[in-house]
């Protein structure tokens, strides 16, 4: 094997963030949530599935199967050229392609492919399904940013896919430039990026109905490295390795969408502040006041079910709050990042003291919500700033009741 080929293979084996194949059950659950809210959500629509070769992708197979049920007008799927993809080291064309007169041994590696299903029974079997797909090679490699795939985006009413995780942010920008509806899979932690958060705050996108705060299983190409614990968890969830894929799991994967669903309109059932302090199931909430931040005018709420329903001020809540967020109940104000316009204090350089007493000068406190304490906590990390002591919490979303 040449040095270049060996390098390509090595890169492919560690491309865990990009080559994730979504399971049929996860697609079905999410799509059903949209249909429950609006049975005609897909009717007479053009759906684009970029990054989804029907030879491998469950997205294309799922929507082809339900083409008539959903009343689709047109289904378009595109795939990325193997030689433009680090996972291409594992690629080999299938019989679906090689048996077709259009097969080109060079283009199969250098060019992307486009698959189209329309309201045409091409094989005369009386139904419109995946057997009626028409395909052709794209002029380019199938990158979603290319002119030809962007033109397909502009033709589509809805884009649905699991984009490469490393390209989630540029893919999201590409979607908003096209002003299309979408449902895509990404990391729940993506909301901590300024550009992503801006869309969430403005109610231009939100979490999907399913897969939140739970494991999602993905297929990966054979030969890609998987942590033993993740492989074992996928097996326990019912996905042992098979002839086609190995399987892994991700605990922070979720759907991001601007398609409406009923679960985002379900109000959180919350206790009052007094009842939380008395009856909360969390020991660190019962009998204590909610701590206030030193650098934001807000109280810290460490658990979603401990949000005081009668509090009228600003609250900092975990980013998993978005799993339960009802835009009719709460307003999203900001995120506790350095770029937040709600910060009321900026700290000079700080000394971070870890649990073992090691000291280091840092600037990290400005990117976290800070709680002032009277004395250094025992056995925990803390910050020193000008003789004052602070502990930092995880990133928080700042919210306020809509009726406050």
Regions found by a protein language model. Give the residues of each.
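Class I S-adenosyl-L-methionine-dependent methyltransferase catalytic core
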Residues: 1-404
């Amino acid at each position: 094997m040449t040095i270049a080929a060996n390098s390509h293979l090595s890169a492919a084996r560690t491309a865990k963030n990009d080559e994730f194949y979504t399971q049929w059950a996860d697609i079905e659950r999410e799509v059903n949530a949209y249909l429950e809210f609006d049975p005609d959500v897909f009717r007479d629509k053009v759906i684009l599935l970029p990054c989804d070769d029907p030879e491998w992708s469950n997205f294309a197979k799922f929507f082809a199967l339900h083409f008539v049920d959903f009343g689709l007008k047109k289904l378009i799927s595109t795939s990325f050229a193997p030689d433009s993809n680090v996972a291409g080291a594992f690629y080999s064309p299938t019989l679906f392609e090689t048996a077709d007169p259009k097969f080109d041994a060079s283009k199969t590696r250098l060019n992307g492919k486009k698959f189209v299903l329309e309201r045409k029974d091409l094989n005369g079997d009386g139904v419109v399904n995946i057997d009626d797909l028409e395909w052709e090679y794209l002029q380019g490699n199938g990158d979603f940013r290319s002119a030809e795939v962007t033109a397909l985006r502009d033709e589509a009413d809805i884009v649905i896919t699991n984009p490469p995780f490393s390209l989630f942010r540029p893919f999201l920008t590409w979607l908003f430039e096209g002003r299309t509806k979408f449902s895509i899979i990404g990391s729940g932690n993506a909301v901590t990026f300024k550009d992503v958060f801006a869309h969430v705050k403005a109610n231009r996108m939100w979490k999907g109905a399913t897969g939140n705060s739970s494991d999602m299983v993905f297929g990966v190409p054979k030969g890609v490295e998987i942590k033993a614990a993740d492989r074992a968890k996928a097996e326990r969830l019912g996905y042992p390795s098979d002839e086609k894929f190995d399987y892994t799991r991700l605990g922070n994967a979720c759907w991001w969408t601007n398609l409406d669903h009923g679960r985002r309109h379900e109000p959180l059932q919350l206790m009052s502040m007094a009842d939380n302090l008395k009856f909360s199931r969390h020991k660190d909430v019962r009998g204590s006041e909610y701590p206030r931040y030193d650098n934001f005018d807000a109280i810290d709420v460490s658990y979603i079910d401990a949000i005081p329903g009668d509090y009228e001020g600003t609250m900092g809540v975990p980013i998993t709050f978005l799993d339960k967020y009802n835009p009719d109940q709460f307003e999203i104000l900001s995120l506790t990042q350095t770029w937040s316009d709600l910060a009321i204090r900026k700290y000079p350089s700080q000394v971070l003291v870890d649990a073992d007493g090691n000291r280091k000068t840092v600037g990290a406190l400005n990117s976290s919500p800070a709680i002032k304490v009277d004395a250094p906590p025992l056995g925990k990390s803390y910050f020193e700033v000008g003789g004052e002591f602070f502990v930092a919490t995880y990133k928080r979303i700042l919210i306020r009741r809509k009726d406050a």
